[in-house]
């Protein structure tokens, strides 16, 4: 960008918007078009050389003058000379004249770049939801927030309200806490996304237009006749397009305002016949509605579609996976169709985020999922070294089997620990086996306290070894004289460890 065409340097640091301060005069090249020359033909020949700025007309028919950009045009030879000569335009038609620029001629990004601190990050992006612009300003920009809001209202079409996210999302209903920094406090919006219409109160629900592509990706995985359980449905960005595709959708959201908007949006898009809406806590929804409906679908041989479960609450969705194992306990049911779970989470760290996301899922499911995973996908970056990820797992609801495995883990642990301590009191030749068993114990995760339990095992093991009897004579003792380790005491010690 030519420095002469930028806002004046004197506006740097402005906190209260002064539109008059952006006025300036600059000299730029013009081409005077002779009366005998067709103005439109000349404009076509000069199309790539025109000076294009906000609210500035480079072609002035009444003056028969075309304003050119000063960067590509510094002299006559910079222009397409031969085509211009054919039109009767000669070198003496090129002149330099002054023009007046003002606040109206600058786009919002140029204005903010000129005003905000030069050596710090400026306004990188914002979201537009209907007539609302939603900002997430860094601390160093807070003194300029009123100015930023006014500039955006002036420059962004149809903007009537500008808000700034005031805190991280920590409330029960996961909606934004926001500050009105410019415009009117009107938060009812109507928007379109992926061919669907949504109405909601932006101040009372969660909506992120940056997830539009992700919503479409999930919809593209669905086919007519499929079944979708949408655990945190919000206002319906998964539910509505899935229902429009011919899927049956069981949708839930805890927020009463989201639930109301969900019902309205299903009606607006004429898909209510394919959707059941619930206003429940997600855990209760999993244990009751999802469980009962899924049992009925699995028992119905007529249902042959695929089953999907969307869990788009990245701050805590993985924690709710703990309720899936054992969900079908006490039921004689064949899992003839394995539900495909799409669970979202935040992964934070400087390295590859995929292993971090997988570890979170495994932590709450209680089993390794490496062999079950379909994919782990990057969704978007939410902060430095923090990404939103989607883990797609086709076997996360092998519920009965997973439940039995988890249920038996404490017994298996006790059995292995007993063997470790018994071997520790026998011959040195068996120490190798002891180490092998101890190594296996380290892989067992009991109540997500693996490291703590392992440390306690080692401490107890060391105490037992320290108290063992002196090494027996080389000649083996008769079987009747062999000492038997006090396994009852060891099992008692182990139980205490497990209860910690």
Curated annotation (Swiss-Prot):
ATP-binding keyword on record: no
Gene Ontology molecular function: any one: tRNA (guanine(37)-N1)-methyltransferase activity
Broad enzyme group: transferase
Keyword field: Cytoplasm, Methyltransferase, Mitochondrion, Nucleus, S-adenosyl-L-methionine, Transferase, tRNA processing
Pfam families, per the entry: TRM5-TYW2_MTfase, TYW2_N_2
Family note: Belongs to the class I-like SAM-binding methyltransferase superfamily. TRM5/TYW2 family.
Protein name: tRNA (guanine(37)-N(1))-methyltransferase
Top-level taxonomy: Eukaryota, Metazoa, Ecdysozoa, Arthropoda, Hexapoda
């Amino acid at each position: 960008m030519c420095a002469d065409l930028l806002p004046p340097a004197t506006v740097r640091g402005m906190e209260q918007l002064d539109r008059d301060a952006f006025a300036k005069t600059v000299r730029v090249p013009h081409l005077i078009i002779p009366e005998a020359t067709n103005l439109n033909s000349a404009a076509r020949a000069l199309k790539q050389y025109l000076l294009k700025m906000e609210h500035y007309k480079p072609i002035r028919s009444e003056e028969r003058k075309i304003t050119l950009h000063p960067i590509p045009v510094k002299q006559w030879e910079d222009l397409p000379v031969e085509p211009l000569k054919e039109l009767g335009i000669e070198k003496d038609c090129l002149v330099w004249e002054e023009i007046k620029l003002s606040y109206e001629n600058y786009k919002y990004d140029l204005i903010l770049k000129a005003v905000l601190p030069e050596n710090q990050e400026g306004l990188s992006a914002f979201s537009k939801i209907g007539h609302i612009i939603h900002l997430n300003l860094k601390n160093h920009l807070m003194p300029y927030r009123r100015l930023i809001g006014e500039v955006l209202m002036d420059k962004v079409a149809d903007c009537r309200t500008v808000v700034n996210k005031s805190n991280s999302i920590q409330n029960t209903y996961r909606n934004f806490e926001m500050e009105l920094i410019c415009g009117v406090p009107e938060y009812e919006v109507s928007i379109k996304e992926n061919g669907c219409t949504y109405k909601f109160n932006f101040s009372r629900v969660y909506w992120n237009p940056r997830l539009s592509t992700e919503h479409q990706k999930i919809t593209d995985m669905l086919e007519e006749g499929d079944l979708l359980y949408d655990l945190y449905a919000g206002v319906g960005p998964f539910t509505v397009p899935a229902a429009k595709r011919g899927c049956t959708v069981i949708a839930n959201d805890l927020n009463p305002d989201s639930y109301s908007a969900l019902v309205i949006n299903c009606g607006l898009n004429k898909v209510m016949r394919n959707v059941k809406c619930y206003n429940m806590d997600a855990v209760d929804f999993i244990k009751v509605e999802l469980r009962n409906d899924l049992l009925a679908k699995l028992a119905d041989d007529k249902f042959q579609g695929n089953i999907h479960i969307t869990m788009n609450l990245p701050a805590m969705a993985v924690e709710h996976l703990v309720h899936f194992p054992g969900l079908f306990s006490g039921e004689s049911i064949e899992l003839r169709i394995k539900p495909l779970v799409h669970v979202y989470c935040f992964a934070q760290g400087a390295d590859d985020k995929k292993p971090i996301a997988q570890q979170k899922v495994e932590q709450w499911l209680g089993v390794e999922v490496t062999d079950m995973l379909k994919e782990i996908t990057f969704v978007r970056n939410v902060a430095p070294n923090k990404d939103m990820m989607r883990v797609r797992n086709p076997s996360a609801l092998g519920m009965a089997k997973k439940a039995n495995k988890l249920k038996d883990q404490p017994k298996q642990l006790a059995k292995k620990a007993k063997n470790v301590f018994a071997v520790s009191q026998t011959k040195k030749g068996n120490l190798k086996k002891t180490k092998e068993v101890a190594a296996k114990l380290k892989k067992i995760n009991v109540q997500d306290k693996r490291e703590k339990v392992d440390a306690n095992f080692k401490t107890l093991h060391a105490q037992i070894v320290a108290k063992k009897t002196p090494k027996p004579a080389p000649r083996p003792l008769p079987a009747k004289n062999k000492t038997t380790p006090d396994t009852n005491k060891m099992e008692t010690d182990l139980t205490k460890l497990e209860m910690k």
